[in-house]
Amino acid sequence: MDKKKKKKKASRLISRFRGLIQACAALVTNIHLPNFFKGGIYQGKGKAVCVPGLNCYSCPAASGACPIGAFQAVVGSSKFSFSYYITGFLILIGVLLGRFVCGFLCPFGWLQDLLHKIPGKKLSTKKLKPLRYLKYAVLLLAVVLLPALVVNDVGMGDPFFCKYICPQGVLEGAIPLSAVNEGIRSALGSLFTQKLIILVVVVVLSILFYRPFCKWICPLGAFYALMNKVSLLGIKVDEHKCVSCGNCAKACKMDVDITKSPNH
């Protein structure tokens, strides 16, 4: 068997193994499946612990809390305090795993992977690289500053990212809950419509582009990206074997030039 065939075989095995890990991670993150038929959410002790990926707290099956939602809940409370626990958790995960979380453990990342497998014309995002900096603005503004600074009369701020932007919330929370709970269904308004539109846009873009939400919008991915340079799990280039052919950069669907910035 020549080298090319060996590489293709290894690539297929890794792809299957990765898909299995993603499916298992999504199941563990949303283990309380019967709640989908009850119209309520799990509120046990597990919700005191954050999960590493983007997964809505309000998902009926969610086994833990979303770190982004939990962080906003703390900084947006009437008694503002910096969330050391959640920040420490994110730093720990970032140092240990980096964006391995995005590629293998995040349910919303897995959904985008599945959507991109739908047959049809696929578009490259290589010329849209500047958009990747948008997720850092989302992290700073929608997750940190706005919930802390824009407050109501009693000093409480809205979880701006979760409330106005996050498509995972409407997919995992609003849609399944309203489907079986008439009270929730009757309370849906313009905000639900707005977020549903965002979800539809993300779904369509995910079919055309590879992981657009991860590349351009996700604040959790932005945080983990900041930890990449110190992460224990990362990519190293063997400079003695690298011939600078550029094949790795062409093959990378996340538009990373591994020879220049393997852990960007």
Residue ranges and their predicted role:
Residues M1-N263:
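Non-ligating segments of multi-cofactor redox enzymes
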